[in-house]
Swiss-Prot record:
This is Histone-lysine N-methyltransferase, H3 lysine-36 specific. The keyword Hydrolase does not apply. Its EC number is 2.1.1.359. The keyword Transcription regulation applies. Residues 9-21, 507-525, 540-555 have a biased composition (Low complexity). Residues 266-282 form the Post-SET domain. It comes from Candida albicans (strain SC5314 / ATCC MYA-2876) (Yeast). The gene is SET2. Residues 832-844 have a biased composition (Basic and acidic residues).
Length: 844
């Protein structure tokens, strides 16, 4: 393995004509246990201090020259940005009662957090706890193993197929600052260590996995990689993940482009063997290929790697003369890019994602210019606000302000977030600030919520104050005044306060990131969720005030609908209401409540509270309207579910009376008569290991089997339910990916329905045959992974199931005119015992 001193992977795509057929190491010996002895395994990154790796800190570095030996030294100053609320998505919780999991924020959900590389955090998003956008926190790694390569040392290969964009592994290690990074480079060189494992996390934060890390450290470099590295916001930390660039086959080595930095690294040969191999990595002279823009940045700027390569070929002499030796991009090429306005949502997401990740001042300047050119398009402006625009702009403005202030304190600056490394002076920064302020003027603002959560008012005030104390640019003053005046007239659409993030102290950081970052936290119950964000009753701890507030709360609870409770919010001096089951919250008494009696006399102590309540009364009315809409939607869903259950029960009774049950569960699609009339009894679902000749008598012999079956088991009904849930979780991990390819033919809803039914069928089959859970050496005694042999059988059965479903799905389109006669036809099939074995699934 070559010298792993790398920054965020460029994810550049080579020409398809150059892509070679991947080599498979299916018979390679598993060296994982041997490799684990060469380093200390970590489950999460450790942090040198509370500043490194933080999303809320900007670091400035100033240089000073020693006259005695003419050598320069660096001093670093960490400055906290204003604390921002967690970035939240606007998805809604999508609880699946069968799978017992929250399906919100999945890969096809259009979740704004997932699109912009931000993980959702429990109790801070409307999507509910334990959504599908928590891969870092839950350590949802792909199945891999370590092997010994011929020339590169250890390598990592896939033990199962990995889909495009699938999360493979987190790059874990010790997060250190730049001073420690440079010291360790020298130390490791003196110790004659052959392999270094550094990765740049931010301008002053590096992950060192040399002595402590995870299996991700064994992924080798390739000039034509099948994976890429991406930076994600997880809580208040930045974390690096490795993702599949394309589909990776089982047995294929996982690689990504190191995009080697130059911090004294020795030049080393590259052994990737690809046709486009650059032959050497590192060293004093960086190759053009290593300086290519990351694909994510190139797309955000509206260019392609091919355009950049063509420019380099034509202007190589210019680049060699003018390129900054410390830069890791082709600056002259970036300067030459003619920026164009953004045309659609895809462009917005690419620009915002790049803006949230990059720290290079020239890239930031170009991206801001692109947003500025698009600020006359109302629909584009709305999208920018939705995709965390205010919080991202707030961060950039704070970094600009820090850079300006650090420039005043020293004669030179070096390597801060928005610095002078590209020749920018205060005038250039002022021009950039003016563009950003004009962008903010053009963005729509209906309520103050997003502006307040981004602390933009305070940031703009800081800019105005700084401007008045320095060059006093009139345009900046006018724009700041205009924005502050406009924002001051906005109302807050009040929300229940979110749980504040707990700062990570040094001791905790030495062991793990945060409680959620370890991936070992469990989902809180509805009661725990409510108690976690419910303010204390009353504002003091005296017995009298507590008793008085408790009496008021009890009187408010009287007459509330079932499962509703009230709680006092000391921040506003008012009561809000929450539902223990649905987790709905509202400031107004829920629908169906009995009216409250006369209010008690208000004493002097309540005066301030009442006045504060009246100040936000208009905002609460708007909130009430939204909450009522949610209530009506929830009641509608309850009524629909109740009717559906009644129809299912009626159908089951009629099936039992007829005596022709096929041993399958009647689906919602069957009840609604959305399937076709035809079909043979070829879809038996009683097992995945072969045809069950007695499938038609499954229910007939079920009770007898229970009575005469073995009684030497100690498993209770509750443990049986637990086993069933575990099987469902195991199958739910595989089935959606297996049948995802059918989505283009039958639609997402039908694929989702088929996945649920397949999970149910396979689970019941395992329980019926008495198969034990996959064994594991873990503390829970079972594994979530299936053997290759079993997985192959499941795939074969699933594809057969879907083939039958496709036939019936296509036939149903041809026979829409005969749908009216379906009831009698279905009755005949049931009477004759010729069912469809549950392979029908359509959108309900």
């Amino acid at each position: 393995m070559s010298n792993n001193n790398f920054q965020e992977s460029s994810n550049n795509t080579s020409s398809p004509s150059k892509r070679s057929t991947p080599m498979l190491f299916l018979d390679a010996e598993n060296k994982t246990q041997e490799a684990l002895t060469t380093f200390e395994l970590l489950n999460a990154c450790t942090y040198q201090n509370k500043y490194v790796g933080s999303a809320n800190v900007t670091t400035t570095a100033t240089t000073s020259t020693k006259t005695s030996n003419s050598t320069s030294t660096k001093s670093h100053q960490q400055q906290h940005r204003r604390k921002l609320e967690y970035m939240t998505c606007d998805c809604e919780e999508e609880w699946d009662s069968e799978l017992q999991m929250n399906l919100a924020c999945g890969p096809d959900s259009n979740c704004i957090n997932r699109i912009t590389c931000v993980e959702c955090v429990n109790r801070n998003c409307l999507c509910g706890d334990d959504c599908q956008n928590q891969r870092f926190q839950n350590r949802q790694y792909s199945k891999v193993k370590v092997i010994q390569t011929e020339l590169k040392g250890y390598g990592l290969i896939a033990e199962q197929d990995i889909e495009e964009n699938q999360f493979i592994y987190e790059y874990i290690g010790e997060v250190i600052d730049e001073i420690s990074f440079r010291q360790r480079m020298i130390e490791y060189d003196l110790r004659h260590l052959k392999h270094f494992y550094f990765m740049m996390l931010s301008n002053d934060s590096f992950i060192d996995a040399t002595e402590k890390g995870s299996l991700g450290r064994f992924i080798n470099h390739s000039c034509n990689p099948n994976a890429f590295v991406d930076k994600w916001h997880v809580g208040d930390r930045l974390r690096m993940g490795i993702f599949a660039k394309r589909k990776i086959s089982r047995g294929e080595e996982i690689t990504f482009d190191y995009n080697v930095d130059r911090y004294g690294a020795q030049s080393q040969p590259c052994y990737c063997g690809e046709p486009n191999c650059i032959k050497f990595m590192g060293g004093k002279t960086q190759t053009d290929a290593a300086l290519l823009l990351p694909q994510m940045i190139a797309e955000a700027l509206g260019v392609t790697p091919r355009q950049e390569k063509a420019w380099l070929k034509e202007n190589k002499s210019i680049r060699n003369q003018q390129q900054n030796d410390e830069s890791n991009i082709n600056e002259e090429f970036v300067n030459s890019i003619e920026i164009e306005p953004i045309e659609n949502q895809d462009g917005v997401t690419k620009v915002m994602s790049a803006l949230m990740k990059t720290q290079h001042p020239l890239i930031i300047k170009k991206l801001i210019e692109r947003i500025f050119l698009s600020n006359d398009q109302d629909d584009i402006n709305v999208m920018f606000v939705r995709f965390h625009g205010y919080k991202t702009i707030s961060t950039i403005l704070q970094d600009l302000l820090v850079a300006k202030n650090s420039g005043k304190e020293s004669e030179t600056t070096d390597n801060n977030d928005i610095d002078n490394s590209t020749g920018d002076d205060d005038q250039d920064k002022d021009e950039l600030i003016i563009k950003i302020l004009k962008i903010l003027v053009s963005w729509p603002a209906v309520t103050k919520n997003k502006i307040a959560s981004a602390n933009l008012e305070e940031v703009v005030k800081d800019i105005q104050t700084n401007n008045e104390n320095s060059n006093n640019n009139d345009e900046i003053n006018q724009l700041c005044t205009s924005l502050l005046d406009r924002w001051s007239k906005l109302e807050m659409a009040y929300r229940i306060p979110k749980q504040e993030s707990v700062p990570t102290n040094n001791a905790a950081a030495a062991a793990t990131t945060t409680a959620t970052a370890t991936g070992t936290t469990t989902s809180a119950s509805p009661f725990e969720r409510i108690s976690s964000h419910t303010p204390e009753v009353g504002g003091t701890n005296t017995p009298s005030s507590t008793s008085q507030q408790q009496q008021q709360q009890n009187s408010r609870d009287a007459g509330l609908p079932e499962n509703w409770r009230s709680a006092f919010d000391k921040n506003t001096g008012g009561y809000y209401y929450y539902n223990l089951v649905t987790k709905e919250t509202t400031w107004e008494r829920p629908l169906g409540s009995l009216p409250l009696g006369p209010k008690p006399p208000s004493g002097p102590g309540l005066k301030g509270r009442i006045n504060k309540y009246n100040e936000i009364d208009l905002a609460k009315r708007e909130e009430l309207r939204i909450q009522k809409e949610k209530e009506m939607k929830f009641i509608e869903m309850q009524n629909r579910d109740r009717k559906l259950k009644e129809l299912i029960e009626m159908s089951k009774k009629s099936m039992n009376n007829i005596g022709g049950s096929s041993g399958t569960t009647i689906t919602a699609a069957t009840i609604n008569g959305l399937s076709d009339n035809g079909g043979n009894n070829n879809g038996n679902i009683t097992g995945i290991y072969g045809d069950d000749k007695h499938s038609k008598h499954h229910h007939h012999h079920h009770d007898k089997h229970l009575k005469n079956g073995p009684r030497n088991t100690s498993t209770s009904s509750s443990s049986g339910n637990n086993v069933e849930k575990i099987w469902k979780r195991i199958f739910a991990k595989y089935i959606p990916n297996i049948i995802k390819k059918y989505e283009s033919e039958i639609g997402r809803d039908n694929v989702k329905g088929c996945a649920k039914e397949l999970v149910n069928i396979l689970t019941q089959s395992e329980i019926k045959h008495g198969n034990s859970l996959p064994s594991s050496s873990s503390s829970n005694g079972y594994s979530m992974e299936l053997s290759d042999k079993k997985l192959k059988k499941i795939k074969e059965y699933s594809h057969g199931y879907m083939d039958k479903f496709l036939i019936k799905f296509n036939n149903s389109k041809k026979h829409k005119s005969t749908m009216g006669s379906k009831g009698s036809d279905n009755h005949k099939r049931k009477h004759n015992g010729d069912g469809d074995n549950g392979v029908k699934r359509s959108k309900v």
